[in-house]
Amino acid sequence: MLKFRQAEEKDIELILAFIYELAEYEKMLDEVSATPAILKEWLFDKKAAEVIFVMEDDIETGYALFFHNFSTFTGKAGLYLEDIYVKPTYRKKGYGKALFKELVKIAYQRGCSRMEWVCLDWNKPSIDFYLSVKAKPIKDWTIFRLDHEEIKDLANS
């Protein structure tokens, strides 16, 4: 039977291991700069995001990292899904769907007006899954990002 649990500070190394596995799957391993100290600060000291695990027989088989954003149009918080990942040996068993549904329940219980996330355009299995749960791609929007160096440069200009 699948269970879910909220991550605790003692899980930092496990969270980081999942982050590395996801980054490897997404072919973005060279972009990971998170460390245990950084995760402790942002996840547990500042509480900027949350992590839940999906578990089988007390073994963490996957994780999701999420946080709240805000919609000025609805006047309510939303749930932003940063990461969702299931270990390869546990895929095709419904664990990812169960983990996603648990996030939907959290969003509903907290009164969120929406859930949002991004998905790599080559990740067809994930895109197909999201479409199957009636998620819609956002048309007419482009995602922008300032990385740390750009933030620093602009802040100091």
Question: What role is predicted for each listed range?
Answer:
Residues 87-89, 93, 121-122:
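Active-site acidic-Proline motif in GNAT/NAT acetyltransferases
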Residues 90, 94-102:
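Conserved acetyl-CoA pyrophosphate-binding loop and the N-cap/start of the following alpha-helix
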Residues 108-118:
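Conserved GNAT acetyl-CoA-binding A-motif
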Residues 97, 121-140:
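Conserved active-site alpha-helix within GNAT-family acetyltransferase domains
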Residues 6-10, 17-76, 100, 138:
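Acetyl-CoA-dependent GNAT
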Residues 117-126, 145-148:
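Conserved beta-strand-loop-alpha-helix junction that forms the acyl-donor binding cleft
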Residues 77-88:
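Conserved acetyl-CoA binding element of GNAT-fold acetyltransferases
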Residues 1-10, 152-157:
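Conserved N-terminal entry element of GNAT/NAT acetyltransferase domains
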